[in-house]
Amino acid sequence: MTEANRILLGVNIDHVATLRQARGTRYPDPLKAALDAEEAGADGITVHLREDRRHIQERDVRVLKEVLQTRMNFEMGVTEEMLAFAELIRPAHACFVPETRQELTTEGGLDVAGQEARIRAAVERLARIGCEVSLFIDAEPQQIEAAARIGAPAVELHTGRYADARTPAETARELARIRDGVEYGLSHGLIVNAGHGLHYHNVEPVAAIPGMHELNIGHAIVAHALFVGFKAAVQEMKLLMVGAASRR
């Protein structure tokens, strides 16, 4: 496989923790899921420590940081609490995401253009500990330009509107937005990733986009794992992605 056809899978294990927190038990263990995902071919593990601690807990992050063989992508709100925690655990990668307490899941991209100074300071702060920051944004030119201006090395394009599209025309339109966003991000020197709402029936067109570096996928894999097991669920997703990327 050439570099142009290579694509990475980041497995988000938040919803393993959601199941655990639903009953306040010690199981299922997100660490076990992470290790199984790595063994099955995941290129990284993504966790989101939310302000309300609805799934992943601080202890999960600390343990994962110590034992992962790949890398941890730490999703976080741009708050003093999370920045201080990131400085403590020193992840290799972090992704800044917008966050509100009432949302079921992240509902849109970060408004980088509307708060450049604040986000620039946060990116620079984590860069000082060797942490590469990506910004979770909508595939809009002004947001991509702002990400490049503030010195973020990477962006993660929000694929929720594509995933939620209800007609073939709407799906095609949203896929084109993502494709244009990847091209525009690359032209600004950014590493371009994507994620949100991707599953086994919609991932291939996104993975096939030239220049797409990594997809972060969680809920679909955790749900499928209930029926086929965690390793098999990860392997199936990776196979779909690699197959699609090979046809670029």
UniProtKB/Swiss-Prot annotation:
Q: Which Gene3D superfamilies match?
A: Aldolase class I
Q: Record's Gene Ontology CC terms?
A: cytosol
Identify the keywords attached in UniProt to this record, alphabetized: Cytoplasm, Pyridoxine biosynthesis, Transferase
Domain of life, per lineage = Bacteria
Reply yes or no: does the keyword Cytoplasm apply: yes
Instruction: Name a biological process GO annotation.
Output: pyridoxine biosynthetic process
Name of a matching Pfam family: PdxJ
Cross-referenced InterPro entries, in alphabetical order?
Answer: Aldolase_TIM, PyrdxlP_synth_PdxJ, Pyridoxine-5'_phos_synth
The UniProt entry annotates the active site at: 48, 75, 196
Q: Where does 1-deoxy-D-xylulose 5-phosphate bind?
A: 14-15, 50, 55, 105
Q: Which reaction does it catalyse?
A: 3-amino-2-oxopropyl phosphate + 1-deoxy-D-xylulose 5-phosphate = pyridoxine 5'-phosphate + phosphate + 2 H2O + H(+)
Annotated 3-amino-2-oxopropyl phosphate binding lies at 12, 23, 197, 218-219
Q: In which pathway does it act?
A: Cofactor biosynthesis; pyridoxine 5'-phosphate biosynthesis; pyridoxine 5'-phosphate from D-erythrose 4-phosphate: step 5/5
Recorded GO molecular functions are:
pyridoxine 5'-phosphate synthase activity
What Enzyme Commission number(s) appear in the record?
A: 2.6.99.2
Report the subcellular localization.
Answer: Cytoplasm
Residues marked Transition state stabilizer (site): 156
Q: Can you tell me which family this protein belongs to?
A: Belongs to the PNP synthase family.
The UniProt entry, under PANTHER family, shows: PYRIDOXINE 5'-PHOSPHATE SYNTHASE
Function of the molecule? Catalyzes the complicated ring closure reaction between the two acyclic compounds 1-deoxy-D-xylulose-5-phosphate (DXP) and 3-amino-2-oxopropyl phosphate (1-amino-acetone-3-phosphate or AAP) to form pyridoxine 5'-phosphate (PNP) and inorganic phosphate.
Name by which UniProt lists this protein: Pyridoxine 5'-phosphate synthase
Q: Mind giving the lineage of the organism this protein is from?
A: Bacteria, Pseudomonadati, Pseudomonadota, Gammaproteobacteria, Pseudomonadales
- Gene of origin? pdxJ
